[in-house]
Each structure stands twice: as C-alpha cells, then as structure tokens.
C-alpha cells in the first residue's frame, strides 16, 4: 500500500464516451486523495467494440481533467485490482449510475477484496448530468 503522505486512488473505466458523471466522480476523488489515476481500460480483444480508441479516450480525459493538478490518465489491460496494486493505490473509486450497477459492483467488490484486502473500494453516485457526454 502507498505511504500515508501520498494517498493514491484509481478511477477505472471504459470512458467511452466520457460523461459529466465520470468527471464528477473523478473530481470528488481528486479532492479526497493526493493522486488520482484515471485508468482507461485497453483490452485488445475489445478492439472495434468501443466508439473511441484507447488513445483517443486518454486524450479526451487528459484534456477534461487538466484543471485537476493531481489527476493523471493511463491505460491498463490487467485486472483493476492488479493495476491498483502496481500503482500502490490505497483505493479504487468507481461511479454508480443506477441501482442495476449495484449488484454487479457488489460481486466485483467481493472478488477484489479477496485479492487485495488492503485496498479500499468506494462507490460514488453522480450528482447530476450522469449520462450527458462532455
């Protein structure tokens, strides 16, 4: 786990496309942690299944989060919990769009907790404009 003086959180997602809901969750995480890594999933087998390439999504997110000094954007192609461990993150922060997300996220939380019990997993519901794209 990271040192207490550099609290790192990972905000994983597809971000295809980026929404104001994504930026709301990222912004709130940036207020709570010293460093927030926005982790854009880049799975080669999903090529052609996303609206934008991973490189485009990284560029869009980098531009959208530019005012947040403690946010950086990276791609990943491993399990989220493995990526968080590699970055020495103390937390994984994800958004909840609707109640239907809860069951899936609950199951993922159980699996992640078994693999990395020292990493906190937080869920945040978006305040407004959840599905409106940037």
PLM features: residue spans?
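Nucleotidyltransferase catalytic core that binds NTPs
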Residues: 1-132
């Amino acid at each position: 786990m990271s040192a207490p003086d550099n609290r790192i959180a990972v905000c994983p997602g597809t971000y295809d496309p980026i929404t104001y809901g994504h930026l709301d969750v990222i912004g709130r995480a940036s207020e709570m942690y010293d460093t927030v890594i926005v982790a854009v999933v880049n799975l080669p087998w999903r090529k052609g299944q996303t609206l934008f390439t991973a490189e485009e999504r990284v560029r869009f997110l980098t531009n959208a989060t530019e005012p947040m000094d403690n946010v950086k954007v990276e791609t990943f192609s491993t399990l989220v919990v493995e990526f968080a461990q590699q970055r020495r993150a103390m937390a994984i922060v994800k958004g909840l769009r609707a109640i239907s997300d809860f069951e899936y996220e609950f199951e993922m939380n159980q699996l992640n907790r078994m693999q990395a019990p020292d990493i906190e997993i937080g869920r945040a519901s978006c305040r407004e404009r959840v599905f409106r794209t940037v």
